[in-house]
Each structure stands twice: as structure tokens, then as C-alpha cells.
Amino acid sequence: MKRTFQPSKIRRARKHGFRSRMATKNGRRVLAARRRKGRKVLTVA
């Protein structure tokens, strides 16, 4: 059986990157929560 995690930088950025977070209301909520928590890194991209 193959491993399920087959990393791809493009796919990672498109799904979880800053611009995709900013594109939706809930994504912006995620960023706000991470800022409030004081995360040094907000997104993967």
C-alpha cells in the first residue's frame, strides 16, 4: 500500500496558503484566530 501523504508545494500553497485563506470569510476567521493567539507563522505559503 502506498503512503497517503505525497507532498506537493503547489497543492499545499493553493489549499492552505495566505491568499486562499484571504479568499473566504472562514479563511479570514482562521487568520484572525491565529493572529489573536500570537502565532509567528500564519500560513504555510
Curated annotation (Swiss-Prot):
Pfam families: Ribosomal_L34 (PF00468). The keyword Plastid does not apply. The keyword Phosphoprotein does not apply. One of its GO terms (biological process) is translation. Keywords: Ribonucleoprotein, Ribosomal protein. Coiled coil: none annotated. One of its GO terms (molecular function) is structural constituent of ribosome. PANTHER family: LARGE RIBOSOMAL SUBUNIT PROTEIN BL34M, MITOCHONDRIAL RIBOSOMAL PROTEIN 34 FAMILY MEMBER. HAMAP family: Ribosomal_bL34 (MF_00391). This is Large ribosomal subunit protein bL34. It comes from Streptococcus suis (strain 98HAH33). The lineage of its organism: Bacteria, Bacillati, Bacillota, Bacilli, Lactobacillales.
